[in-house]
Amino acid sequence: ALDRVHVVSDDVGWCAERLGDLLRRYAGTVDYRPPTSTPQGDFRMVATSPRIIGTNSTFSYWGGYVSNVIHGPQSTVVMPAFHARHMDGGRAYQLDPAWEIVEDIPGGWDG
């Protein structure tokens, strides 16, 4: 189990509602982005983390790329396969082959 998970999102309410119980199964503490944080601080938090569970966003992709450079083989990046409905059957083309890919979640991506 992890000691702590820090959630960075522009919709922490959705994250707490949809992911809170799941995250608490794996981490002693779940922290959510404070309302006073800045985009630069959020990016620094994500990019310097050795383990990232990202979203289908440019912000997360770049955080994962930078984490890979900083932490090398010790970096673990988990990203969803889904990106956008109108492209390539919804699958993200930006995924690094070194990342772990989540194909689906319980209830689906819209659930």
Regions found by a protein language model. Give the residues of each.
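N-terminal targeting/anchoring "stem" of glycan-biosynthesis enzymes
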Residues: 1-111
